[in-house]
């Protein structure tokens, strides 16, 4: 076990999250079809500033992430600053940690506040799976570079004459891991088989996610943290996430065919999170700065931890490695938590992590700990549904989870919450949040 590591400034100030906001999330090629991630980021940051009631001149820094990169706007953070009327002197840089990207943005801001280099900052992320960087083949790319160096038309024509018809076809973004060639769904299948996660249990978790998310919207619990989005030509308002199945039944899930292992698999489109568009952001500052501005804290960041594991086997077990570290650094145990929110990339991955939380064998053999952190009380787990229902704009999910958990803790009268996620590349993230 590691020692507690308080997240406080030299003056003893805690890290405050004052406000959080997101756009409604939308399935690929639906509500935000044609809207790039940078525009989604501008929308949410502009509205967050308006709702927070502070001058944009006070923002020292914006740290923002994007996983599906736009070649024409590689630093999405700076483009958001320039496109929202914020001061041109506001520092801005971009981060990427796959599905844990906005967790990283929040951690970076927290570290800057602790170091004293930043007083007030915004952290978040945005992604679009509808506006994708479509590439060209390696053969065509090399020919284009060589042609740019050619001195005559005949030299250029000679270069292009070597190309085959297939070299001219567009190349879609890769969905597999660069280092292994494995898709995340392949790893989810492997974990389902390794840890005995049945198709029935996966479908049941997916149904639960949709039912709880539908209830959250019906009860009005998400209205304050999800803005209304207006997209050109501004004829319709987007007010809710459009992936949530409000009236699905378990029998419908059983009808879907496996998506990755077609013959023997159990991971389907229904028990996986879909490709999604959206953006989310949080406003952060030191505790004394919030008091000076008269801004009540939504909550506090108690601790965070990141993990990295093997990518060939169990790549999506990041939460099982990062969570014990975050708990130790906060000086608490799993039993102290009021809420637990885990990113549902796949139902199989989620259920496998829950098993590892409770496994003494895993704790001893993989973590070097004498015992497991504990079995999760499902009455505390993903109480408003998860990513299977809401969707997963890669860089925005962490900020969604943080805001959602803080608001739900406040609605319940306070307490401690865990937000945790797996990420491509064998990465994991975990954060402990507190509401008084």
UniProtKB/Swiss-Prot annotation:
Gene3D superfamilies: 3.40.47.10. It is found in: Cytoplasm. One of its GO terms (cellular component) is cytosol. One of its GO terms (biological process) is fatty acid beta-oxidation. Pathway: Lipid metabolism; fatty acid beta-oxidation. CDD domains: thiolase. Keywords: Acyltransferase, Cytoplasm, Fatty acid metabolism, Lipid degradation, Lipid metabolism, Transferase. Coiled coil: none annotated. Heterotetramer of two alpha chains (FadJ) and two beta chains (FadI). Catalyzes the final step of fatty acid oxidation in which acetyl-CoA is released and the CoA ester of a fatty acid two carbons shorter is formed. This is 3-ketoacyl-CoA thiolase.
